[in-house]
Amino acid sequence: MPLWKPAAIADRKRITAHIAQDNPRAAMEMGDMLMDKAALLDQHPMLGRVGRVKGTRELVAHPNYIWIYRVAAEVAEVLRVKHAAQQWPNA
């Protein structure tokens, strides 16, 4: 599994909590889907495109969510999980 940095863990929790306000089942499914994508990164760490920030890569984990990650010693480190509508990198 990729290494989840604290900011990415917080992002993931915030996303699922937001979804759970309206639909707890959908929140659980989103959390599961995000973790399923983690298995892909574990096997193929270079899967995502070159990131907008030097040294990062980006993977569309869901049409609404993008993972920002880096690869260190062939291990993917998930740095952030951003909604596709959010500005990244921050201005």
Where are these regions (language model features)?
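Enriched for short, Lys/Arg-rich terminal
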Residues: 66, 70-91
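Short hydrophobic/aromatic beta-strand or adjacent loop that forms the aromatic wall/cage
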Residues: 56, 64-66
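Basic, Lys/Arg-enriched alpha-helical interface segments
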Residues: 1-56, 91
